[in-house]
């Protein structure tokens, strides 16, 4: 997942024009790419890796190369800087491959992405790294049915495909009624542009008639699993929200690449530690709220200050029974405390 952070000035590393999903347009700023570990059972996510996306300098270098106007010194600098001459999609893929090679776990099998990462180069790279990708396809994707009939005898190539999928006719799909307003249709189809078979789930809103196309490179998954996994991807959005509101993700005034990287890592690490603290408090199933945690820590500090000025020990019986209740005063949810 990617997040855009506004940044004033002209000399900070990574400044460029990046897509802002909140405003549905490109805006100038700095972008970070975050890989997160999603806990499906606890319905939360932990930041695993954060890297800053190179800015527009890499684009300018590629344009000069295509036009043949780059001099020898510019080419040498581009070669020395390495990742700046790559496309942004290649930088995202490099990050995934590095993390996949470093994290050895049987539970790490799937990479959950949005539609921006649904392209052939990225999918091929993810599969080559040993992972399966679950993501979203364009609504107008041309998908082909696999031929399931008898093979004809004799020489020549056998029939492989059996027509193009029509969203208006899903009779050849297996249907699962998820709830009163949502039906899931699943089928293994071929994507000609990706040149591979995908497990495709058509999510249909029976009330409005709208639909979305989800996919998985693992053709053994069922419709509910693909849907639940893709829905869990949105927990990463809460990482950006909490980090920007409470741990200063977008407040760094540094300009160098190294200092910015340190700031981004510290901001997301603080958020991870807050979630680990809640899990260690024997509340693994409680809803996480950074605002409630901040309020509770403030209340605890205030009570301790008052007791210290009154020269009263916290172990006194008249304080010990109500201490926890006072610490929880003003929190959003008792479960989040």
Feature locations, PLM:
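Basic, amphipathic alpha-helical segments enriched in Lys/Arg and hydrophobic/aromatic residues
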Residues: 251-306
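Short amphipathic alpha-helical "interface-anchor" segments enriched in bulky aromatics
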Residues: 4, 223-254
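An internal, acidic/charged active-site-proximal segment
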Residues: 65-200, 281, 286-288, 335-337
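Charge-patterned, long linear interaction tracts outside catalytic cores
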Residues: 193-220
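Active-site-proximal, Lys/Arg-enriched surface segment
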Residues: 2-55, 61-63, 182-185
């Amino acid at each position: 997942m990617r997040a855009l952070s506004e940044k004033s000035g002209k000399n900070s590393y990574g400044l460029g024009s990046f897509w802002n999903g909140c405003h549905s347009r490109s805006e100038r700023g700095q972008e970070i790419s975050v890989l997160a570990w999603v806990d499906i059972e606890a319905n939360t996510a932990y930041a695993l890796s954060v890297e800053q996306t190179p800015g527009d300098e890499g684009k300018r270098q590629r344009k000069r190369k295509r036009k043949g106007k780059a001099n020898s010194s510019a080419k040498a600098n581009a070669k020395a800087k390495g990742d700046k001459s790559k496309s942004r999609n290649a930088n995202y893929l490099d990050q995934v491959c590095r993390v996949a090679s470093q994290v050895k776990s049987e539970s790490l099998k799937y990479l959950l992405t949005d539609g921006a990462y649904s392209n052939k180069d990225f999918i091929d790279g993810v599969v080559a790294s040993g992972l399966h990708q679950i993501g979203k396809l364009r609504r107008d994707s041309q998908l082909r049915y696999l031929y399931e009939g008898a093979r004809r005898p004799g020489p020549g190539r056998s029939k492989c495909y059996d027509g193009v999928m029509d969203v208006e006719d899903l009779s050849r799909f297996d249907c699962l009624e998820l709830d009163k307003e949502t039906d899931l249709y699943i089928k293994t189809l071929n994507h000609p542009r990706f040149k591979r078979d995908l497990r495709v789930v058509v999510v249909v809103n029976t009330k409005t008639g709208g639909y979305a196309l989800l996919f998985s490179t693992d053709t053994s998954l069922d419709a509910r699993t693909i849907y639940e996994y893709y829905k869990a991807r949105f927990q990463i959005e809460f990482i950006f929200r909490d980090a920007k509101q409470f741990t200063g993700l977008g407040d760094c005034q540094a300009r160098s690449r190294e200092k910015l990287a340190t700031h981004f890592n510290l901001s997301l690490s603080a958020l991870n530690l807050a979630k680990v603290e809640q899990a260690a408090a024997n509340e693994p199933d409680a809803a996480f709220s950074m605002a409630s945690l901040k309020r509770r820590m403030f209340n605890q500090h205030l009570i301790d200050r008052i007791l210290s000025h009154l020269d009263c020990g916290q172990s006194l019986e008249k304080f010990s029974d109500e201490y926890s209740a006072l610490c929880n005063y003003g929190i959003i949810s008792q479960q989040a405390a």
